[in-house]
Amino acid sequence: MTEPTFAAADTDLLTEPRLVVEPGVAARVAAVAEPVLQGMGYRLVRIRISGEAGCTVQVMAERPDGTMQIEDCEAVSRALSPVLDIADPIDRAYRLEISSPGIDRPLVRRTDFERHIGHLVKIEMAVAHQNRKRFRGIITGLDGDGVCITRDDVAKDQDPSVVLPMTDIGDAKLVLTDELIAESMRRGKAAEREKKRDLGLAPPLAPHAKPAAQAKPKPKLKDGQAAKKPLPTNTKKHRLAADRARRGEIDPD
């Protein structure tokens, strides 16, 4: 495995601030964890402290491109565990758990919303917007400091489009759909290919390589049937006729 480094990763993505942050003890853990993660080339997504089965501190992290492999989680755990032991932000015994954001991940940064335009999201506002706090819909884009969604739960006489101020968002999470699963699998395969190239297990991309052209659909007639292929115009008969025409002869046909 090749761990990302601060020099190799995109600096702007690594240092991009989170819009959704934790309160209380989780905030103290985040203050310790985030510099460690950034130094390794990872981004902090979320800290969650659970009292189930004792105390579990979940640190959700990712690479700047949004991926996170098992090897990445293991590397973060080895680096972060001793730092947390020294800083001691929690006053009781706990179990440290490092995880990826998952497919139906939380959206905590502006770039998270940008990457998932076209996908379904559930948003809970910390500050009510249009007299409501909960919204659900398709992310259609960004407008300044707001995220644009098309709601799927509105009445017929209501405008489904709404722009939510990102600074007022308390929680945002993707909704698991077939399209989201397919997109996640595509990104995972791309990350795996990139890792193999980094390890020398796969050939690098050729500089002139181009994506395969998509097959064009056959033209359709009005009745829905495929159009017939036009007759060839460069047969031996056509060539002989052209020669006779050039010589001024009359084509018997």
UniProtKB/Swiss-Prot annotation:
- Location of the region described as Disordered in the Swiss-Prot/TrEMBL record: 186-253
Bias (Basic and acidic residues) occurs at 186-199, 240-253
Family of this protein: Belongs to the RimP family.
Q: Which InterPro entries does this UniProt record tie to the protein?
A: Ribosome_maturation_RimP, RimP_C, RimP_C_sf, RimP_N, RimP_N_sf
An annotated GO cellular component of this protein is: cytosol
Q: Which organism is it from?
A: Bradyrhizobium sp. (strain BTAi1 / ATCC BAA-1182)
Q: List locations, semicolon-separated.
A: Cytoplasm
Q: Which GO terms describe its biological process?
A: ribosomal small subunit assembly; translation
* Keywords in alphabetical order: Cytoplasm, Ribosome biogenesis
Kindly give the HAMAP family that the UniProt entry links to this protein: RimP
Q: Which domain of life is it from?
A: Bacteria
Entries under Pfam families matching the protein: DUF150_C, RimP_N
**What is known about what this protein does?**
Required for maturation of 30S ribosomal subunits.
Supply the CDD domains for this chain.
YlxS_C (cd01734)
Q: What is this protein called?
A: Ribosome maturation factor RimP
